[in-house]
Amino acid sequence: MNPIVKQFKYGQHTVTLETGAIARQATAAVMASMDDTTVFVTVVAKKEVKEGQDFFPLTVDYQERTYAAGRIPGGFFKREGRPSEGETLIARLIDRPVRPLFPEGFFNEIQVIATVVSVNPQISPDLVAMIGASAALSLSGVPFNGPIGAARVGFINDQFVLNPTTSEQKISRLDLVVAGTDKAVLMVESEADILSEEQMLSAVVFGHQQQQVVIENIKEFVKEAGKPRWDWVAPEPNTALINQVKALAEARIGDAYRITEKQARYEQIDAIKADVIAQLTAQDETVSEGAIIDIITALESSIVRGRIIAGEPRIDGRTVDTVRALDICTGVLPRTHGSAIFTRGETQALAVATLGTERDAQIIDELTGEKSDRFLFHYNFPPYSVGETGRIGSPKRREIGHGRLAKRGVLAVMPTAEEFPYVVRVVSEITESNGSSSMASVCGASLALMDAGVPIKAAVAGIAMGLVKEEEKFVVLSDILGDEDHLGDMDFKVAGTREGVTALQMDIKIEGITPEIMQIALNQAKGARMHILSVMEQAIPAPRADISDFAPRIHTMKIDPKKIKDVIGKGGAVIRALTEETGTSIDIDDDGTVKIAATDNNAAKAVMARIEDIVAEVEVNAIYKGKVTRVVDFGAFVSILGGKEGLVHISQITNERVERVADYLSVGQEVTVKVVEIDRQNRIRLTMKDLNNDTPVAENVTEEAEVSSEQQAEI
């Protein structure tokens, strides 16, 4: 086995592509590496098309093996399970730029599998997987119009950084992944810390320029190791059938696309399809229903696109830059912490915000170790939202992808843990859908967070843009419908505040989208975003001053870190008793910060008082109230200051002679005691002599446990 290797510099990193030694029964296989992060990518393509196949069955799977990071999986089975959310998102990242590069009419099944086999914690495997998939598809000989390149762009100290390391990403104001061919950008996925439209576009152009080195080296790699190109020819169009369908359907489809209401329009289109199929199959039984539907779909595209290019009104009668009618309601669910319904035309999202404590944070088990996520965003797309029946269950890839995009849009305005010590979860339920439900989720989330009293930095709105391009003519569309998304050449989603962009996602189906066109789209999107923000600000101009009565209130106090073990107790006994007895939730940080969450303010204050007792220092000669915990022959043990036990010797109970301790004291009895001595082993000696229940007792709070105005914040 003599592997063929291609190595090249890519920014600050070295990329290695290797083929010919592993997985030789696959159509193509590439071991792609970037500075010790290695992803093994295979492509298997079927030479024959399944009978009746009428779509392109491309599957992309991305999987991370824990051995790549020198770890053994957790859990009972000790092996990797179903794909995580992160793996699903990276699979989509690979799929989106390669799918449009297969020719129309190519229906052969292809599976791409990317497996992470080694990981350098400083190099994210997603970019390596994209480069490996591009190389493997290019080597395979399938009719793939690539290769593509991929680049990650950061923005640090007002400078763009190519493929920043994990450490650099933490201080970057931008995380943008761009993929494309040598001629055109195909995909952008990004989140930003409120950057301008010009900065975002410059980042896209920068990434596309820098990735050309990847494309050139893959082309050279293919010359050396590529398989012969498949002798595939697109099927000849059935001109006679096309003319028959046109004669029966074209005028009727044109009329149908003047119906503005989606369901009524779809019913009319379905009726036309059924009628045309019935007529043509009656004339010739060999005619394929699938072929007729494909021709009708092409007619729909031609009619809608032609009208847009000609400057005619859109499907629902709008001009190119008009946003659909908006309707906003906040506080719609009485017992939730924050809620809103955002409606844009026939797209509607019910967004709900929930506040939780530190223990509600999501622990994510990644290759490089565990991390905690304090902001959760879940997007649900039930079948009723489009008037259909369907399966309800675990989220599909699309729901995971849309949820992550919406989360990216809102993340930049979320408060820090110091500013707002809550874990926040937002759920967006799509109740109606006709285009851009992910951007409706961004708007709904912003409204629900403000309704919940989350001090977000600014309101965020999202808008989906579209494009229709015919030769040199093009039209950019604001707030696209589902049909315009399906029949157009670009899906371009922008989320942001009045000050700038927080998320940008772009999927382009054709070549020839220039930076100038992208600039027009971004500027048009900005105008639409400002309009939506104006309407949102009328509904709720700022976050609520107070959180919901049904949300937990977090009280913060500071204790000496050395006292943390006392508050937790042996095996967690003390803290468990505190939470169970008061119905509160207690979290303690390593620096001694104690966070108490409770819906009952009195319960929180009671817990704080008990913690103050626990951490307070016992002072010699101080007098305390205590409770008898044990009675023995030689005296009684009394608990003071939240659990510190001291001994009252039989001789110290009273000035009289005591024969039996039980004659004077019983378990649970409250007594007043004075500290006589604390010995070297921290044992406390107490006395009850000359004391009674009216004797003034010491304050139970010492300097270490005092809660100052700076240390305590009642949220």
UniProtKB/Swiss-Prot annotation:
GO cellular component: cytosol
Main location group: cytoplasm
Cofactor(s), names only, from the UniProt record: Mg(2+)
Annotated spans, Disordered: 695-715
Uppermost EC category: transferase
UniProt subcellular location: Cytoplasm
S1 motif domain location: 621-689
CDD domains reported in the protein's UniProt record: KH-I_PNPase, RNase_PH_PNPase_1, RNase_PH_PNPase_2, S1_PNPase
Domain of life of the native organism: Bacteria
Stored InterPro entries: ExoRNase_PH_dom1 (IPR001247), ExoRNase_PH_dom2 (IPR015847), ExoRNase_PH_dom2_sf (IPR036345), KH_dom (IPR004087), KH_dom_type_1 (IPR004088), KH_dom_type_1_sf (IPR036612), NA-bd_OB-fold (IPR012340), PNPase (IPR012162)
Residues that, per the record, bind Mg(2+): D485, D491
One MF annotation (Gene Ontology) recorded for this entry: polyribonucleotide nucleotidyltransferase activity
SUPFAM superfamilies: Eukaryotic type KH-domain (KH-domain type I), Nucleic acid-binding proteins, Polynucleotide phosphorylase/guanosine pentaphosphate synthase (PNPase/GPSI), domain 3, Ribonuclease PH domain 2-like, Ribosomal protein S5 domain 2-like
The keyword Magnesium belongs to this UniProt entry's keyword annotation: yes
KH domain boundaries: 552-611
EC number: 2.7.7.8
BP GO annotations: mRNA catabolic process; RNA processing
Reactions catalysed according to its record: RNA(n+1) + phosphate = RNA(n) + a ribonucleoside 5'-diphosphate
Subunit structure: Component of the RNA degradosome, which is a multiprotein complex involved in RNA processing and mRNA degradation.
Family: Belongs to the polyribonucleotide nucleotidyltransferase family.
NCBIfam families for the chain: polynuc_phos, PRK11824.1
Task performed by this protein: Involved in mRNA degradation. Catalyzes the phosphorolysis of single-stranded polyribonucleotides processively in the 3'- to 5'-direction.
UniProt name for this protein: Polyribonucleotide nucleotidyltransferase
